Amino acid sequence: KAPKKKPIPMYLNALVVQNKDGKFLLEKNEDEKLLKGFWHFPLIEVDDFSQEEEINLFHQVSEESVNFGPSPEESFQQDYDLKVDWLDYQFDQIKHVFSHRKWHVKIIAGQVNDFHEFKDREVRWISPKEFSHYPFAKPQQKIWQGYERTYLDNGRQ
């Protein structure tokens, strides 16, 4: 019997974005084989999380490491056509192990004042009270719990 393969690490940013009505942006996973049909906070895959930390650690950055392309926040704003006020919060990293993948998820939170509905894809603004009507996979539940722990427990909403 072949030895069990170690899950491949994947690094993702979960963008937890709230509108002025207190609803959160969720998207239905339509195309992935993994977790198809579940609703999720927008996720952006990155190579790893070390790039950002390295920039903060060293004031002088070598020429070739300057251009990482758009940040996850910039990618999100382009993909969803929203102007987001990103919050400067440090959330606990979320980890979730599937049989063949290990997700490392960093939460990035933001708020929008001007928002729109999405006609072209399965994206909705949903209040936390309604979350139970939408199937969430376990990693998304962990993301929401991590968000609540840090953000809502600090008395902000």
Q: Which ranges hold each PLM region?
A:
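Intrinsically disordered, low-complexity, charged terminal extensions of DNA damage-control enzymes
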Residues: 1-157
